[in-house]
Amino acid sequence: SQFKAMCDEAHKYGVKVVVDAVLNHMGNKSKNDLSPCIPDEIRNNSSLWHDISKNSWYASRHDITQYCMDGIPDLNTSNKTVQNYAIKFLKECVDNGADGFRFDGAKHIETPADSGFGSDFWPTVLQQAMLSQQEALHLSIMVKFLIKQQVTMTKVTVSQSLILIHL
């Protein structure tokens, strides 16, 4: 693949490849604008998406994780099908040479600590995706949300990989 060839070439020069992963939203303003690379089983299953008619304007932690931001199609990251899709994507990146990830819009994905609407997205996706290689280390990441709530999560990641969570 072109991605693998790029990673191989970068590694020849000691350059690490960090993938900008967008795991919670896709497209721009409507489902009609979804990327053609999204499989039909994701695109056409309404249970995998948050209600696009509900917009989040950072009113609450619930709203920024359960509603769409300015009408951008937002995946239901608590759904196991969505989690498996994310795991598959991240594993393919690692298997093809990615050294780490920057997670765009991480604050828009619920955590286990979100009372009443939390999910295991982060622990499940990061652990399963990164354990495709045998070495692992525990990494504690502090995620600070716009509502000034702090949640500490323990992640499992491949040793020598870089995980950045973009807020």
Describe these PLM feature segments.
Residues Q2-F3, S56-I64, M69, S115-V125:
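Active-site-adjacent beta->alpha loops and helix N-cap segments on the catalytic face
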Residues S1, L48-W49, N55, R61-T65, ...:
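Broad hydrophobic/π-residue packing in well-ordered secondary structure
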Residues S1, C68-Q83, D99-F117:
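The substrate-binding groove and active-site-proximal loops of carbohydrate-active enzymes
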Residues D33-I72:
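Core domains of carbohydrate- and sulfate-ester-processing enzymes
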Residues C7-V19, H25, S35-E41, K88-L167:
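Active-site-proximal helices and loops of the catalytic beta/alpha 8
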Residues S1-D8, K12-K16, N24, R61, ...:
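N-terminal structural segment of carbohydrate-active enzymes
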Residues S30:
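Active-site-proximal N-terminal segment of extracellular/periplasmic enzymes that hydrolyze or transfer
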